[in-house]
Amino acid sequence: MDIVIPFVESDDDAWLDVFLKAKNLHPKNEKARQIFFVPFRRRYSSHGLFKYWWRALEQNYKSLTKVHLLLMQPSQFPSFLRKDDPRIVAHYHNEFIPDKHRPCFNSSTIELCAIKELDLKGNFILSNDDMYVNAPVDDSCFEQDGKPLAFFESRDAYGVFNQFRKTLTNGHKLVMDHYAKPLPYYHWHHLFQVYNAEFCKAFLNDEWDRISKGLGKWRRDHDYNHMMLMMAQNVAGMSVHSDKFPHKGYFEMPLFTVEQYSNADSFQVVCFNDTDGKHTDLTRKYLSSKYPSKCSFEV
């Protein structure tokens, strides 16, 4: 199965130039340049951990076909990766995001445009760079009888507590309107999501006039995100609920303790959601001890 993953690395000077210009910030020297970027660094840094994503992937997911790497521009291609590896397909934003939404720093816009425009076929996995295949898996963990697997658990309404919940609410309403029927609220799982390319492309094309109004360069309250595709697949009978789908390995790092790293070994897919970077050293220690050797993706 293919994996689609957006990636950004703020240590790339060329990318940072684009970012500061898009923010209408014009530092006069390098010191000012770095100071201007301080409030944004935590969201746009990989904290130097991305190589472990690839090492874990190769060690634990033997049936991988390709990785579709979504990048703003060529300077963002990770220096540790082999550019000639046929399993790595780099897609730059100008290939799939409309001009009016570029430069794009909105992951929802990036993901939805990629799913709609790229030459994806069959079922694929959507990942983030903080999600690791941490124990052996194969395609049977992610699909059954040709349909994507998912874990559905009802919850109360998403509400508008924060921007992410607002985008979930937007997608929930769109899917209800599309199918003209009530739709339960589902727990979201910030881990791998499995989508069927043909179904998702058809759904996005049908609703693109409405969805496109929620696209933009930056995150906004009226965005839509890819989770609406999970909802739509379920309503349409295109996905299969399964307890074996890897959905439990999410770790909210501000609430995480050192002792809990050992728990990560028991999950096939884990997410270390550490956007403020406070646990970077501990996460690196864990990952480097588990995946110390270079993989064949690396130079």
Could you say what each language-model-derived stretch is?
Residues 56-64:
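Short, acidic, metal-binding catalytic loop of nucleotide-sugar glycosyltransferases
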Residues 135-164:
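Conserved donor-nucleotide/metal-binding helix-loop-beta segment in metal-dependent transferases, i.e.
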Residues 11-15, 75-80, 132-136, 141-144, ...:
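Short catalytic/ligand-binding loop motif for oxyanion handling, primarily in non-cytosolic enzymes
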Residues 121-134:
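Short beta-strand-to-loop acidic/aromatic patch adjacent to the donor-nucleotide binding site
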Residues 249-299:
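Extended C-terminal regions of large enzymes
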Residues 41, 45, 76-120:
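Active-site-proximal specificity loops/subdomain of glycosyltransferases
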Residues 163-266:
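Catalytic core and acceptor-binding pocket of nucleotide-sugar-dependent glycosyltransferases
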Residues 10-42, 151-152:
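A solvent-exposed, charged loop/short amphipathic helix patch at secondary-structure junctions
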